[in-house]
Amino acid sequence: MSQALPLVTRQGDRIAIVSGLRTPFARQATAFHGIPAVDLGKMVVGEMLARSEISPDVIEQLVFGQVVQMPEAPNVAREIVLGTGMSVHTDAYSVSRACATSFQAVANVAESLMTGTIRAGIAGGADSSSVLPIGVSKKLARVLVDVNKARTMGLRLKLFSQLRLRDLAPVPPAVAEYSTGLRMGDTAEQMAKTYGITREQQDALAHRSHQRAALAWSEGKLGDEVMTVYIPPFREPLSEDNNIRGTSTLADYAKLRPAFDRKHGTVTAANSTPLTDGAAAVILMTESRAKELGLVPLGYLRSYAFTAIDVWQDMLLGPAWSTPLALERAGLTLSDLTLIDMHEAFAAQTLANLQLLGSERFARDVLGRAHATGEVDESKFNVLGGSIAYGHPFAATGARMITQTLHELRRRGGGFGLVTACAAGGLGAAMVLEAE
């Protein structure tokens, strides 16, 4: 039974995506070394508004995300408003849904449009793996708080005497689950073993991703959606992603050792997405507001779905869970799609999700559905490459995927596209897009 949920305003307007832009994505500690995520966010939003020629006063809300948050700027969205010349009266708040953060930002703006509280808004995300909130040990943190409360020098010295040398070591943010302690790569290894995914299959997918991304750049398909960034000392601009290995061979991938399960593993640095810096954003409006402003939308948001599963085993199955729900809400099936873009956190995770989308047993026994979502047609899948090649600034990836998919749909004469991602915490996200 169809459970389509049309995403329209009270007046029947569709949710239009009129513009999208991102910075080039740069590997950790390379081109964007020393540039915080908030500045990357300001760059992309300021440039997007300038290119669109939309008056900043038109934008009534900005929802932005940052996964690795900096204590000095916890509401990155508001800092972007204040730092880009937008009206100080523009509502702005920040969200976080791990790797699906900009999916959430888009959904929040869409919901504001549907309720009628705004007619235009910006959604996006930015992250820096090069500018990190380096912390201190729990013992040192407690001593510092107590020292601040101590009234005498003697008491302060007594508190400091409790510390050992190891307590003074800096503590970087962990790329691991808070509740389990498992690293994302540990989960990818679980999935490779559970679903029988070989090292050769993972390397082949990673190689495909890089080859297709390199081809997309060489054919000029990404130039309109990626800005040029001038970074200190302003000698050389950055215009393209710097992680793509267009000249690599499968033999190159085979040389790398496993990165997580060193003895029996198959997940390597080459078949995983790297730590990355970057930002991406989109402008959303009601369809009637876009017409008033004389804007031709890139496309429309047809549906979205978020899901959650247990975190202890194979938790990166978000696409397999959220895709059938998003399709159902769009009133579509997998065969109706022109393009399918899945976030490649790891090749093992991507291949596991593809396997389960076509599994009747998974659909019946796990999802409680009568039939599998469907086998994914390779000719529709990640046609321009994916996150393994482009990189993955956590909060920016969703907005990159949305913009990239809409542009490619338009090049193909329109149709429906699916963008979907897994996320830490056992979360999943999927959105169905439409272009004319």
Swiss-Prot record:
CDD domains: thiolase
PANTHER family the UniProt entry points to: ACETYL-COA ACETYLTRANSFERASE, CYTOSOLIC (PTHR18919:SF107), ACETYL-COA C-ACYLTRANSFERASE (PTHR18919)
Domain of life: Bacteria
Location of the active site: C99, H392, C422
Keyword Transferase: yes
GO biological process: fatty acid beta-oxidation
Pathway the protein acts in: Lipid metabolism; fatty acid beta-oxidation
Disulfide topology: none
Subcellular location: Cytoplasm
Subunit comment: Heterotetramer of two alpha chains (FadJ) and two beta chains (FadI).
GO cellular component, one term: cytosol
Species lineage: Bacteria, Pseudomonadati, Pseudomonadota, Gammaproteobacteria, Enterobacterales
Catalytic activity annotation: an acyl-CoA + acetyl-CoA = a 3-oxoacyl-CoA + CoA
Family: Belongs to the thiolase-like superfamily. Thiolase family.
A Pfam cross-reference name: Thiolase_C
Name the record gives this protein: 3-ketoacyl-CoA thiolase
EC class: transferase
Gene designation: fadI
NCBIfam families per record: AcCoA-C-Actrans, FadI, PRK08963.1
